Amino acid sequence: SYIYLLAREKTPLNRLFTGFMPRSKFSLESLQTLAEHLLGSHDFSSLSRDNPLVPNHICTLSKLDIYEWRDLVRFDITADRFLHNMVRRIVGTLVNLSHFDLGPQELLNILAEKNPRQRLVVTAPAQGLYLSGVRYPNLQLDETPLP
């Protein structure tokens, strides 16, 4: 799982710890509507870095919550696996589509294209991206205390 924190304004206090996309105006409602269409299994070729060594780009997003948190917009994303740059491209592309007031059909077209160089795909800055959890479904950990 990942958390992405996006600032609406860049300040000296948040500039190193939050993402900021200048010249982007977006609405929380629009982001949430677009995000609903990414839940489930999809081919995320368009929303990840092009890598010919990765044969399968299908990932299952089980959670994509977007909400106001303090003076930030917070994205909570959980999936069965993540591709390189996938979270940052999801965030950047959702913000870009919201900025241009484009709807879910445009997002579905981006996914269908399977083109990481698609013109509407934007990569959000690395600042603001946080790993929040790792789960291995079939892993049984030995709970024996360390000496």
Regions found by a protein language model. Name each.
Residues 1-147:
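Structured-RNA-binding interfaces characteristic of tRNA pseudouridine synthases
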